[in-house]
Amino acid sequence: NLEPNVKDAPGGLRDVQLIDWTAKRHFNVTRRSQLVEKGFLLQHEYLKLYADEEFLWKVRYGLHLIADRAEERLLFDHQRTLAKMLGYEDMMGKLGVEKFMQKYYQTVLSIRGLNDVLHQHLDEAIYRDNKTKHNSQISEHFFVRDGLLDTISHDTFRFYPTGLIEIFVILGENNEIEGIRASTIRQIRHSTHLIDANFRADAKNRKLFMRLLNAPYRLSFQLNRMNRYGILGKYLPEFGKIVGQMQHDLFHIYPVDVHTLEVIKNIRRLARPEMAKQFPIPSHIFKNLAKPELLIISALYHDIAKGRGGDHSSLGAEDVADFSKRHELQENETKLVRWLVKNHLIMSFVSQREDISDPQVIHRFAEQVGDQMHLDYLYVLTVGDINATNPNLWTEWKGSLLQNLYMQTKKALERGLGIPIDKSRWSQNAKNVISKKLLEHDIAIEQAEKIWGDIGDE
């Protein structure tokens, strides 16, 4: 988050110690280097873990110097000072503190990825060792062994690189599979170099990625796995640039990649029955979208251009248009996702910063949206985005503003944009409603009419 705990946060020093404690206990060794001899760690994993740990110790030591006491949290007020202390300078339009925080987040992501391998390794060695062996082949290149997905051979990805996407599709389409075997996670992490321009140009890989975005089970979990193992940023290089990318402000508390995947998670959760109570309209809309994968693509790209300089919405719109062309979206689908990325902030802006009781504001927003389909997709994207920016950002009040804007715009679109908005008609309608309420309570309307005479239609 915005102020991660260097010791106890996921991927922090405690995770490194946990690797040491559990592995040394299981293998009965005293030094981490002996874990290489035991085959638990590969040599390059050992060296990378050492480098990552050394970086975190430097950060922790620097924090203690700055705070003049034991301080484990990378407090916002300390981040800029610590970045300068460690040699990160402002350069090429990017703040030194943002470069430092990106290095931090990429480091803990690397440790988390290695943790996946090692903890799965221990799970198999300790808890699954005496299980009844049950294997079932699920595709030409993969089979399920005791609930865990495995490759047919130790070099499957070398001969079948497409498997680097297919394995996540299988997980997204088969909810009964518990996870991936440690040896296979290791293969994935060590095969990212196979994802090159030719891989990205392969129609089969592109179709598989689109199939993944339609997968019924735990899509955000699979995308997070792909991110930890380095696959997502290799397949989508533009996504790779935002991995660990932080904005040094108090508004955005997550790195851009984490925020993006959280938006997708929020959107997909709307399909759950329990979400209908908290988000009744967005939930209903999402369940009835003709092409929900277009919303997922828009979410994946809405902040893709953060950190480049310039208008990230416009730059991201160009990126998603390129993605759409590569993945053979229809022209109308491309136009929709491009529009959503370019305009993903407008509904939040209008609902919170403009007077949505003004018919002209509603009419202007309805003109920007154009039709009901664009309004539906934008509303769900906006709800998912706000909830993934900062847990404290979403309030019932902001939710009611968004819902009010949605409903008024829906009515404006139903009425037709070609019909000019008559403020006096809106005002008269309001008077009629009030008059009816007054009469129901046996209250004379003369006093209200006197007040109305002193104020305008607004």
Model-found features: residue ranges?
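Long, K/E/R/D-enriched contiguous segments that form extended
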Residues: 197-298, 307-313, 318-328, 342
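Alpha-helical scaffold segments in soluble metabolic enzymes
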Residues: 110, 166, 170, 208-211, ...
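Non-catalytic interface/linker regions that flank or bridge core catalytic/transmembrane domains
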Residues: 1-252
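Regulatory modules associated with amino-acid/nitrogen control
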Residues: 55-56, 95-149, 219-221, 366-458
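A glycine-rich phosphate-binding loop feature that marks nucleotide/adenosyl-phosphate handling sites
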Residues: 76-81, 128-134, 184-192, 239-245, ...
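Hydrophobic side chains within alpha-helical segments
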Residues: 18-20, 262, 388
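Divalent metal-dependent catalytic cores for phosphoryl transfer on phosphate-bearing substrates
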Residues: 37, 44-45, 49-58, 65, ...
